[in-house]
């Protein structure tokens, strides 16, 4: 394995400076963990890709995808991911895309430590409630979120393991848990010994903006941010109800590396007992 780094305090607007950092550190593989949630962060990753292509020592690149299987058609609200893939396809860099489904942290926090800002979405174990997009019967994949440098969470562990694969395929999956939302609620009720208050949202309701937040999310966010969060969750919920978060027929790193023991949904609910 060559030298691997995750870029930290650098100027992502300066491609030349980024290239210099990669070359001075002799970085073979770049793992981008930038939070791609707006045009600025999307451009930062594009600049990092350009710098990696210009670097004389950088050969491989993992873009900050780590979610569902993003495609241009179902996810017009996430154009930055498509732009990164388009940019990588024009380079000589070897690259791969890693799909993990949803971050399990959004159910686990704060009972299981996380380095991302997480409040309970969809299922709220703190308040024994759930706001489920669709009928809750579409399989959804969950995985624990990455913590860069410490490798203390599942996605980080599997990503590091991926670096030992000499020739990457275009896409890999990390499927640590695969179940429907109804199955997840049923398991939570079984483990906690309480009945959850479950609200279902149809696709029509979500398209009209008639979405709702879990009690924990309402408490975590200022009231002026509720509307924006509802809109964002409605968009993702529509895709989820259609099965966009289900991951199948992709090389699964969980199968390739059975020595890694991931956090399960049951582990999360046990933490809330």
Regions found by a protein language model. Name each.
Residues 19, 152-160, 262-270:
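Short, amphipathic alpha-helical "lid/cap" segments that border enzyme active or binding sites
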Residues 9-58, 70:
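NAD(P)H-binding glycine-rich loop region in Rossmannoid oxidoreductase-like domains
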Residues 248-273:
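Amphipathic terminal alpha-helices
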Residues 1-3, 8, 15, 68-197, ...:
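Oxidoreductase cofactor-interface core, primarily capturing Rossmann-like NAD(P)-dependent enzymes
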């Amino acid at each position: 394995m060559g030298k691997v780094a995750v870029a930290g305090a650098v100027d992502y607007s300066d491609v030349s400076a980024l290239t210099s950092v990669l070359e001075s550190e002799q970085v073979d593989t770049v793992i981008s963990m930038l939070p791609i949630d707006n045009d600025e962060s999307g451009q930062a990753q594009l600049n990092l890709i350009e710098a990696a292509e210009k670097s004389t020592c950088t050969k491989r690149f993992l873009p900050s995808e780590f979610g569902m299987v993003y495609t241009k058609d179902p996810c017009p609200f996430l154009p930055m991911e498509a732009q990164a893939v388009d940019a990588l396809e024009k380079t000589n860099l070897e690259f791969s895309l890693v799909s993990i489904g949803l971050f399990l942290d959004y159910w686990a926090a704060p009972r299981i430590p996380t380095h991302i800002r997480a409040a309970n979405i969809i299922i709220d174990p703190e308040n024994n409630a759930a706001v489920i997009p669709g009928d809750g019967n579409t399989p959804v994949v969950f995985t624990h979120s990455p913590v860069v440098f410490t490798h203390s969470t599942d996605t980080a562990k599997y990503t590091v393991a991926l670096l030992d694969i000499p020739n990457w395929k275009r896409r890999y999956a990390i499927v640590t848990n695969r179940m429907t939302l109804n199955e997840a609620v049923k398991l939570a009720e079984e483990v906690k010994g309480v009945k959850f208050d479950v609200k279902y949202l149809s696709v029509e309701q979500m398209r009209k903006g008639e979405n709702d937040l879990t009690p924990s999310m309402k408490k975590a966010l200022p009231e002026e941010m509720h509307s924006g969060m509802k809109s964002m969750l409605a968009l993702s919920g529509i895709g989820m109800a259609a099965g966009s978060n289900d991951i199948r027929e992709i090389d699964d790193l969980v199968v390739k590396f059975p020595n890694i023991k991931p956090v399960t949904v049951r582990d999360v609910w046990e933490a809330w007992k």
